[in-house]
Swiss-Prot record:
A Gene Ontology biological process term: translation
Protein family: Belongs to the bacterial ribosomal protein bL33 family.
Pfam families reported in the protein's UniProt record: Ribosomal_L33 (PF00471)
HAMAP family per the UniProt record, alphabetical: Ribosomal_bL33
Gene3D superfamilies associated with the record: Ribosomal protein L33
PANTHER family: 54S RIBOSOMAL PROTEIN L39, MITOCHONDRIAL, LARGE RIBOSOMAL SUBUNIT PROTEIN BL33M
Protein name per its UniProtKB record: Large ribosomal subunit protein bL33A
Organism: Salinispora tropica (strain ATCC BAA-916 / DSM 44818 / JCM 13857 / NBRC 105044 / CNB-440)
Keywords (A to Z) from UniProt: Ribonucleoprotein, Ribosomal protein
Length: 55
């Protein structure tokens, strides 16, 4: 089993456009201790929007 304080946990990125679309990725806690924000494509609104880490 994985440790609770895994260095690279799996995080869910949720669209800020309000569509409910999500990406699943991993992040390195040592390099990115804050919540992750990436600009990615949301196919529901057909444009690039910010995706924020949802906990």
């Amino acid at each position: 089993m994985a440790r609770q304080t895994d260095v690279r946990p799996i995080v869910r990125l949720r669209s800020t456009a309000g569509t409910g679309y999500t990406y699943v990725t991993r992040k390195n806690r040592r390099n990115d201790p804050d919540r992750l924000v990436l600009r990615k494509y949301d196919p529901i609104v057909r444009q690039h929007v910010e995706f924020r880490e949802a906990r």
